[in-house]
Amino acid sequence: MFKAIVSADTLGAALDSVSVLVDECKVRLDEEGLTIRAVDPANVGMVDLELSASAFESYETDGGVIGVNLDRLEDIVGMADSGQLVHLDLDEETRKLHISLDGLEYTLALIDPDSIRQEPDLPDLDLSSEIVIEGADIDRAVTAADMVSDHIALGVDPDAEEFYVDAEGDTDDVHLELDREDLIDLTPGEARSLFSLDYLKDMNKAIPKDAEVTMELGEEFPVKMHFDFAEGDGHVTYMLAPRIQSD
């Protein structure tokens, strides 16, 4: 059983954060809220989403797992105006999700969860640097790097206490430095890793510009990015594997 009412903004933000990496996913339901964990087909980008029951206007479930086509569900939720409420009701016999918003009624066929790729484990990494940065600054760095290259280096200079971004193209380069004053917080350590810009651009689309993003970095390690949404009732963790640099 699953019945819920939630604002279209909150549900849309949750779906966006996952759909930038995968087209379908398992949604785990329990009394505390819903969780989604998924990895893209190339095993490069991972997302872990938690949406607390307190993010909903009302929320009832006796637990379970459903499989969802994210593109179709996003299209439906996208029909709602900002601030409108979306009503969700799972029909367990037909395995369909009934969605109603502003007089519109949709019935969404669900996917067998067993046919969806197994959820990944979220590795426990000991990363040397932690940067707390505004979503708008990540957007600026990604946009600048995208003008010259298809990959981006993220690093920390512990001596200068700076977070930096490097992008090197065939002819042009971009370098951006943010010191402690430009950041919300910085725990410096030796860190530099190279990443695919395509993945970072996709993740950036789902990061609110006013979000406080906690970024964890190491030396040729994955980057972890955490941020809250829905007034703290939603939490997203992204992890992106590095590109291995050949000498």
UniProtKB/Swiss-Prot annotation:
Tell me which Gene Ontology terms the entry assigns under biological process. leading strand elongation; regulation of DNA replication
Keyword presence, Transmembrane helix = no
Among the GO molecular function terms of this UniProt record, one is: DNA polymerase processivity factor activity
- S-S bonds: none
User: Which Gene3D superfamilies does the UniProt record give?
Assistant: 3.70.10.10
UniProt keyword terms in alphabetical order: DNA replication, DNA-binding
State the InterPro entries in the record.
Answer: DNA_clamp_sf, Pr_cel_nuc_antig, Pr_cel_nuc_antig_C, Pr_cel_nuc_antig_CS, Pr_cel_nuc_antig_N
The question of whether DNA damage is a record keyword is answered with no
Quaternary structure, from the entry = Homotrimer. The subunits circularize to form a toroid; DNA passes through its center. Replication factor C (RFC) is required to load the toroid on the DNA.
Q: What does this protein do?
A: Sliding clamp subunit that acts as a moving platform for DNA processing. Responsible for tethering the catalytic subunit of DNA polymerase and other proteins to DNA during high-speed replication.
Q: Which HAMAP family match?
A: DNApol_clamp_arch
UniProt protein name: DNA polymerase sliding clamp
Q: Which organism is it from?
A: Natronomonas pharaonis (strain ATCC 35678 / DSM 2160 / CIP 103997 / JCM 8858 / NBRC 14720 / NCIMB 2260 / Gabara) (Halobacterium pharaonis)
